[in-house]
Curated annotation (Swiss-Prot):
One of its GO terms (molecular function) is DNA-directed RNA polymerase activity. Keywords: DNA-directed RNA polymerase, Nucleotidyltransferase, Transcription, Transferase. Belongs to the RNA polymerase beta chain family. Its EC number is 2.7.7.6. GO terms for cellular component: DNA-directed RNA polymerase complex. Pfam families: RNA_pol_Rpb2_1, RNA_pol_Rpb2_2, RNA_pol_Rpb2_3, RNA_pol_Rpb2_45, RNA_pol_Rpb2_6, RNA_pol_Rpb2_7. One of its GO terms (biological process) is DNA-templated transcription. InterPro entries: DNA-dir_RNA_pol_bsu_ext_1_sf, DNA-dir_RNA_pol_bsu_external_1, DNA-dir_RNA_pol_su2, DNA-dir_RNAP_su2_dom, DNA-dir_RNAP_su2_hyb_sf, RNA_pol_bsu_bac, RNA_pol_bsu_CS, RNA_pol_bsu_protrusion. It catalyses: RNA(n) + a ribonucleoside 5'-triphosphate = RNA(n+1) + diphosphate. This is DNA-directed RNA polymerase subunit beta. The RNAP catalytic core consists of 2 alpha, 1 beta, 1 beta' and 1 omega subunit. When a sigma factor is associated with the core the holoenzyme is formed, which can initiate transcription. DNA-dependent RNA polymerase catalyzes the transcription of DNA into RNA using the four ribonucleoside triphosphates as substrates.
Length: 1220
């Protein structure tokens, strides 16, 4: 009866049934390795590299030089990471390391050398968990996805401003000016080709080419006779080099005066100066890869013989060039079998000038290019029409700047595209995008700081006459480095407060990728194309996980297996396939650019025992599309079924059965699940839960192999026979999101452990597996309308048994200041405080740990000097003569904030006397940590893993819940209407499989895209004696009658999310008002009111609720005098005054005045009541104040005299209403 399955072990002794078909999947890597490797690169490569770019620092007169001694870098870390981090968090410090370097000072006159090691900086150091502790808070540096340096050719690009289409090429450096060559392709006339540097005005391309030494003849010789080029030559009138340089100078340096020296330096300073223009290794790699021959000469015909250095014909004229042949021709140029051509007819004045400045002999070598003449098609070959020159750059270039060969090859490629040679690039492809990781971001900050140090040092040297007195230490000031890092970690968009709700959220925030930030995109202007999922994202960036809202598609997550190569491109692993045989011995890591023309099969392909692919035909991925090919044509196979998705998306079982939008919500909401008091791993898992638990920083792994000799709630000691190693556990710590971090040991004294083994369960972890929620019995049924619109009905059992109970920790702080008026005093004797509020204080006035405190209770007793606001001259004189008199003290104690009562779990006292570093004027700081036990209640948000979210609407007694035939009451009732339209069928399959798991007392693992098939679930129904439909007879708990139809009932994994009603529920009676508008503030944090807006006003107007409206728009809003008067009258028992003018009316009057409309308000004193009347510019008949107007049924105004009313009480007339 059993369908074939394997038992796989997960976590600490949990066996799960696996029914998938994937053969050998690659083990999940340590998810934090890329972050740690990047920081390691910064320390050992990035810092020395930055020094090489800036040093040696040479004085203006050349007499003094300061250089950096390679290999002298020394990093001094704190000895015990755990204790250093704990201290940093408690005391609000930064966890940092000291970096020392050795610098050498050389006097050129006497050759005297002085070597000195200096403290370069103390900057934030990465923890083992891939985070930084900045001012006591845990932060992460997010990776950035930006356009790669290099060259990007694009055809038919739409201009933002107009509807014209353009061809263009962008030359993108890592540092320096962006350059563009472009021309319009729409319109009747042939357009000239233009050139642009940064956002400056357009320059004719001919001007730029002339400025670097080309003549009309050389331009035509190298770049052919396309109509656009001929038109550009025809229209261009400036002949000489100087005239063209002058034109460019006026545009690029429009505010500078033209000098001969300036003209000579213009082009070299923009392009050839490595300090100002740098392609970096990535840019050079991209240029060499793009500007070769292969793409352009494939599928063309040779128009001349290709001859070797020994004059041997290697490739004959008329040969059809396949891609393979094109690769061969390129290879011959690479190893110089076919000689490169020297660029002729170019005026090398600029290069001579550049050579003079930089003494860079390599510049002369860069006058060589690879030239091949081809016919684009057979027709042009047969007609022997003029061939097209295809020019490639020198393949052995390694310069970090542009050189002449590059410029010629770029212009050649641009004109080749007009002959349909080569292909345009996709700027949204990962071929043209790279990742800037934490190490590179820190290196950029370090470079900026070193540039400032260089400038300061040169200034310092120039002011000293006697250079011998200067030491390295006195010249180099490390303050810029400290300031630069401080600014970066505190204010950069890429340095973010870590999401620490649960281990999954923490892992996801460390693997986040953003397209925003400096040098990136702007969320307001980013187009749909940039945000869209791209085919190159496969295995590199998750297509599912991204935020909802305006950041959609701009903030992304790495896929499970993705890594970053030396150039910053994302690489993903594959197994190679040759002649249907899969080679599992070696993993091949490929970047997006290396996937061209290769075919990739999925990991779920059936493979026999000899690793041979069984099916003859397969659906494969090739060149951004899916094809059905023979098995022999497959080149690679995926390493795992979860290769495409991120960690969060991979944790959703039956992901393949869900709509992508709901999967997106599911992966985002899993990160918001609060850790519960008792964690429980899911019955239906995906297999990634163990990896998340193992690599999470909230769990602890053994640092050595050995025997456990001691275990308690705060530490575990492991002895390897040489030296016992103490592992400290995190005990009742507060996370960034105020959830609880508590580690519980999973080992006992005497256990033997291996290095890297989990030795404790952290928050949301159960036996070494991620456990975000609970397995509960769920029925899909309606129940008296209480689960209408995604509302959730839960059983009281979940509340009583603390199933969804979580602990939250709030921190409250108080500072004791010293001022001129006097000092704050810590005391238990607080003036005018009730005995009840002081109940939990000790003799010093600090709350006792373990106390149960409620809103308004005093946590720390503090009195502050009242201070006299404006003492008179006589009082000042008396104080000066007799000394300060004892000022009266006022109560400024720290009280429990509204809704933040709970159990005091810790008191932390920081004092200047103990050597703690506190801000100016603060002598002592006390932190109180209060733990709140929150049971689930009406208004809390809950969710499953499939994007099925809702709010608890009612908590029913167990006896009222619907129950099964055996009397088992269900825990949760969900609305079945929430499934069909959302198309997340995964939740139904999980429900059924969960029921099977419970009946068979087993657990399942169903990885994404390799899960249990529906046929298998049906067979499992038989095994578990469950009806084939998976539905059960359900009875109403109230009436005891069975429901009309069978209902789907099963076990589903439900999460309680951070959006809890306790944080959101709020009401206001009296509170603060805005200073500018005089209207109540908004929001719970400011004790604000509920905004009653324009549309709400319309609703009341439609009902004619005048008195309610009058109150809302005046007393309760911005009628300043009215509300004060009202308050006083309520206190004194007086009558409610009539409403005056709201402040917003005055704003309207000022607004109209700005539009030159004068609004007059005439006030008549009548019976001591103010009557405001607004003169209308139209002359309407004046209605006397002793008339009431009212509409009759015809809509005409009828005027009734007041005298007709017998019981007329003059005192109670609201004259404001009359005039209105």
């Amino acid at each position: 009866m059993n369908h074939i399955y394997k038992l796989k072990s997960y976590g600490i002794g949990t066996d799960r049934r696996f029914y998938g078909v994937a053969n050998k999947t690659l083990e999940t890597p340590d998810f934090l390795d890329p972050v740690r490797e990047s920081f390691d690169w910064f320390l050992h490569v990035g810092i020395p590299e930055a020094f090489d770019r800036i040093f040696p620092i040479v004085s203006a007169n050349g007499k003094l030089e300061i250089s950096f001694r390679r290999g002298s870098l020394r990093v001094e870390k704190p000895e015990n990471e755990y204790l250093a981090i704990r201290e940093a968090k408690i005391k609000g410090k930064t966890y940092s390391a000291r970096v020392y370097v050795t610098l050498v000072k050389v006097h050129s006159e006497d050759g005297e050398m002085e070597e000195q090691e200096i403290l370069l900086a103390e900057f934030p150091f990465m923890t083992q968990g891939g985070t930084f502790i900045i001012n006591g808070f845990e932060k992460v540096v997010v990776s950035q996805l930006i356009r790669s340096p290099g060259v990007c050719f694009r055809e038919n690009v739409r201009n933002q401003q107009a509807d014209d289409l353009f061809n263009k090429v962008e030359i993108i450096p890592q540092l320096g000016s962006w350059m563009e060559i472009f021309h319009k392709v729409t319109g009747n006339q042939v357009d000239t080709v233009k050139f642009r540097i940064d956002k400056h005005k357009n320059i004719p391309l001919l001007s730029f080419l002339r400025a670097i030494g080309f003549t009309n003849e050389t331009v035509r010789k190298y770049f052919g006779n396309s109509p656009e080029l001929l038109e550009s030559i025809r229209r261009h009138k400036l002949e000489s080099l100087e005239e063209n340089l002058e034109l460019i100078y006026r545009i690029v340096r429009k505010d500078d005066r033209i000098t001969e020296e300036g003209l000579k330096n213009l082009i070299p300073s923009i392009i050839f100066n490595e300090r100002r223009y740098n392609l970096a290794s990535t840019g050079r790699f991209m240029l060499n890869a793009k500007l070769n021959l292969v793409e352009r000469i494939s599928q063309t015909y040779l128009a001349e013989d290709l001859v070797s250095k020994k004059n041997k014909i290697l490739f004959k004229k008329g040969t059809y060039i396949t891609r393979q042949l094109a690769l061969e021709i390129q290879e011959k140029f690479n190893n110089e079998e076919i000689p490169l051509s020297e660029i002729e007819g170019v005026d090398s004045t600029i290069y001579a000038r550049q050579l003079e400045i930089t003494r860079n002999e390599n510049l002369w070598k860069r006058f060589y290019v690879a030239i091949v003449k081809v016919w684009p098609n057979k027709k042009s070959m047969l007609q022997e029409s003029e061939p097209v020159n295809v020019i490639a750059t020198d393949p052995n270039l390694n310069e970090k700047t542009l050189v002449l060969s590059d410029i010629i090859a770029i212009v050649s490629y641009y004109f080749n595209l007009l002959s349909n040679l080569g292909k345009s690039d996709d700027p949204d492809s990962l071929v043209n995008k790279r990742i800037v990781s934490v190490g590179e971001l820190l290196q950029n900050q370090f470079l900026i700081a070193l540039t400032k140090i260089e400038k300061n040092s040169k200034e310092k040297i120039s002011t000293k006459s006697d250079l011998s007195q200067l030491t390295v230490k006195s010249i180099i000031n490390n303050k810029p480095i400290y300031n630069q890092f401080k600014n970066f970690f505190n204010s950069s968009k890429l340095s973010q407060f870590m999401d620490q709700i649960n281990p999954l959220g923490e892992m996801a925030s460390k693997r986040k990728v953003t397209s925003l930030g400096p040098g990136g995109l702007n969320r307001d202007t980013a187009q749909f194309e940039v945000r869209d999922v791209h085919t190159t994202h496969y295995g590199r960036i998750c297509p599912v996980e991204t935020p909802e809202g305006q950041n959609i598609g701009l903030i992304l997550n790495f896929s499970v297996f993705s890594r970053i190569n030396q150039y910053g491109f994302i690489i993903t692993p594959y197994y190679q396939v040759k002649n249907r045989i899969v080679d599992y011995s070696k993993v091949h890591w490929l970047a997006a650019s290396e996937e061209f023309d290769k075919s990739f099969a999925q990991s779920g392909v059936e493979i026999d025992q000899n690793n041979r692919i069984i099916p003859d035909k397969l659906t494969v991925r090739k060149n951004q599309t899916y094809l059905v090919l023979d098995a022999e044509q497959v080149n690679y196979i995926d390493v795992s079924s979860m290769q495409m998705t991120s960690i969060s998306a991979s944790a959703i079982p039956f992901l393949e059965n869900n709509d992508a939008n709901r999967a997106l919500m599911g992966s985002n909401m899993q990160r918001q699940a609060v850790p519960l008091i008792k964690s429980e791993a899911p019955l239906v898992a995906t297999g990634i839960e163990e990896a998340v638990a193992r690599f999470s920083a909230t769990n602890l792994r053994a640092s050595i192999s050995g025997k456990v000799t001691y275990v308690d709630a705060k530490k575990i000691i492991i002895d390897d026979g040489e030296k016992p190693e103490i592992h400290y556990l995190r005990y009742f710590e507060k996370s960034n999101q105020e959830t609880l971090i508590l580690q519980k040991p999973t080992v006992k004294v005497g256990d033997k452990v291996k290095k890297g083994q989990l030795i404790c369960d952290g928050p949301s972890t159960d036996n070494g597996e991620l456990a975000l929620g609970k397995n509960v019995l769920v029925a899909f049924s309606t129940w008296y309308g209480y689960n209408y619109e995604d509302a959730i009905i839960i059983s009281e059992k979940l509340v009583k048994d603390d199933v969804f109970t979580s602990i939250h920790i709030q921190e409250q702080t108080i500072k004791f200041r010293s001022t001129k008026a006097g000092n704050d005093i810590l005391t238990a004797e607080i003036p005018n405080a009730s005995a009840k509020s002081r109940l939990h204080l000790d003799a010093n006035g600090i709350v006792i740990v373990g106390s149960e405190v409620d809103t308004g209770d005093i946590l720390v007793g503090r009195t502050s000097p009242k201070g006299e606001d404006n003492p008179t001259a006589e009082e000042k004189l008396m104080a000066a003569i007799w000394g300060k008199k004892a000022l009266a003290q006022k109560d400024t104690s720290l009280r429990v904030k509204n809704g933040e009562g709970g159990t005091v779990i810790d008191v932390q006292i920081l004092s200047r006397d103990q050597g703690d570093n506190l801000e100016e004027g603060v002598g002592m700081l006390i932190k109180i940590l209060i733990a709140q036990k929150r049971k689930i209640k009406v208004g809390d948000k809950m969710a499953g893993r499939h994007g099925n979210k809702g709010v608890v609407s009612v908590i029913l007694p167990v006896e009222d819940m619907p129950f099964l035939e055996d009397g088992t009451p269900v825990d949760i009732v969900l609305n079945p209407q929430g499934v069909p339209s959302r198309m997340n069928i995964g939740q139904v399959l999980e429900l059924h499989l969960g029921m099977v798991a419970k009946k068979l007392k087993t657990k399942f693992v169903t990885p994404v895209f390799d899960g249990i098939k529906i046929e298998t679930i049906k067979k499992l129904f038989d095994e578990a004696n469950i009806p084939e439909s998976g539905k059960f007879k359900l009875f109403d708990g109230i009436s005891g009658q069975p429901f009309e139809n069978p209902v789907s009932v099963g076990y589903m994994y439900m999460l309680k999310l951070l959006h809890m009603v306790d944080d959101k529920m709020h009401a206001r009676s009296i509170g603060p008002y805005s200073l500018t508008t005089q209207q109540p503030l908004g929001g719970k944090s400011q004790n604000g009111g509920q905004r009653f807006g324009e549309m709400e006003t319309w609703a009341l107007e439609s009902f004619g609720a005048t008195s309610v409206l009058s109150e809302l728009l005046t007393y309760k809003s911005d009628n300043i005098q009215g509300r004060n008067l009202l308050y006083n009258n309520i206190i004194s028992g007086g009558k409610i005054p009539s409403p005056g003018t709201p402040e917003s009316f005055n704003v309207l009057a000022y607004e109209l005045r700005g539009l030159l409309i004068k609004l007059e308000v005439h006030k008549n004193d009548q019976e001591n009541q103010e009557v405001e009347e607004i003169k209308d510019p139209l002359e309407l008949p004046e209605i006397p104040s002793n008339f009431i107007d009212e509409y009759n049924q015809d809509g005409r105004i009828e005027l009734n005299k007041l005298e007709e009313f017998a019981d007329f009480d003059e005192e109670n007339i609201d004259f404001d209403k009359l005039t209105r």
